[in-house]
Structure formats: structure tokens, C-alpha cells
């Protein structure tokens, strides 16, 4: 699977250094996944997954800028930036999350639609969020929310989360029929994939 990014250079961002019943799935421990202590971000930072590529470069600007290219997302940093400053770390992390969310908005909905069609599990709409507390959720009306942090997962775990949420369009709880449905789409590996997802760690 290749990342989908605009062919043209994205506009530059300057960052200042200053109803229905809802099933809320913490699909398998995103909060636990984020308990890993975050390492400082600097010019050596890279994200390279099948769906998302991002790196930092030094530039001659007086502010940070984010550019989308055919190769991925490039964050251009001021030449004399001090990465040890907490405000710089917050700024860069926010820029990365913003870029990741934009990429997720282009990447995840077509993938969800393809899986929906393949397994005959229609949904009403999909929304990409910046949620740090759950991978996804599905409402009783078939509206699905997906976290942009899914872009950091390997493809088989990304598919698992999407299939998990699509399963809720038919089975609104985590009872036996839910797991039978999810097993039917994952080769009987639903619980194994859940366990693998719970063990997924990242430095970011």
C-alpha cells in the first residue's frame, strides 16, 4: 500500500512558539500504547510506515513550515532551533499530528470503504479524529470515528481496527457473535490481533 499525498507542495504553516448510543472502543489500549516515554524529537526523527512518511530538515526560515511532497511530509526547521526547549517539542509534535491527521483523512476513508464493500458491512459516515485515547469508535447509527494515530500501525493491525469498527455496525457489543464475525474476517485471529495491538509500542 502506498501513501497518498498531494503532488504539489502544500501551503506553508507558520507555528508560533508561544441521538444515538455510542460504542466507545478503546480498541485495545491506545492509552497503554502511549505510556511509552516519548523521546525528544530532533532532526534525526523519522516516521516511515506504509501509510505515512515524515522527516525533519533544517532550513533557512525563521519559523517552522510543513510541506507535503510525493515522498511524504517534510517539516522544515529554523537553522538555529533549540530542540531541548519544551515549547519547541510541543510545537513540532503538534505539527506532526496535524500532518498525520491530514494524511489520515486521505488514506483511511477509502480503505474503510473498500473493507466495507468486501465484507458487506455498510457504514453511514467516517470522521478522522486526533484521539489519543481510542483507536476508533462506532455509533448506533453506523457513524465511525478513526484516530489519525492509526497511520503509525502496520497494515494488518490497521485493517484489524477498521474491521473491528465495521463489525459494530452489525453487532453493537463485544459478545460472542461480535467475535465470531470479526474472526470470520481475520482468519480466526481476532483475539490474537487484539493482543498484538495491545503490545504495539512507539517512541512518538
Model-derived segments and spans:
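Walker B beta-strand of ABC/ABC-like P-loop ATPase nucleotide-binding domains
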Residues: 162
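Walker B catalytic acidic pair
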Residues: 165
Amino acid at each position: 500500500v502506498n501513501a497518498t499525498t498531494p503532488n504539489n507542495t502544500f501551503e506553508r504553516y507558520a507555528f508560533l512558539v508561544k441521538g444515538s448510543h455510542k460504542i466507545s472502543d478503546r480498541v485495545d489500549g491506545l492509552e497503554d500504547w502511549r505510556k511509552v516515554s516519548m523521546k525528544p524529537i530532533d532532526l534525526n526523527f523519522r516516521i516511515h510506515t506504509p501509510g505515512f512518511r515524515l522527516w525533519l530538515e533544517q532550513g533557512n526560515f525563521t519559523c517552522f513550515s510543513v510541506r507535503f511532497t510525493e515522498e511524504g511530509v517534510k517539516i522544515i526547521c529554523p537553522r538555529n532551533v533549540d530542540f531541548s526547549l519544551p515549547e519547541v517539542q510541543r510545537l513540532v509534535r503538534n505539527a506532526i499530528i496535524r500532518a498525520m491527521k491530514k494524511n489520515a483523512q486521505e488514506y483511511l476513508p477509502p480503505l474503510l470503504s473498500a473493507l466495507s464493500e468486501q465484507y458487506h458491512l455498510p457504514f453511514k459516515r467516517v470522521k478522522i479524529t486526533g484521539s489519543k485515547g481510542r483507536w476508533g469508535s462506532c455509533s448506533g447509527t453506523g457513524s465511525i470515528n478513526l484516530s489519525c494515530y492509526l497511520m503509525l500501525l502496520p497494515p494488518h493491525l490497521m485493517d484489524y481496527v477498521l474491521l473491528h469498527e465495521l463489525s459494530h455496525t452489525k453487532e453493537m457489543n463485544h459478545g460472542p457473535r461480535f467475535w465470531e464475525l470479526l474472526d470470520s474476517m481475520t482468519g480466526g485471529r481476532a483475539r490474537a490481533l487484539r493482543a498484538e495491538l495491545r503490545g504495539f509500542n512507539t517512541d512518538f
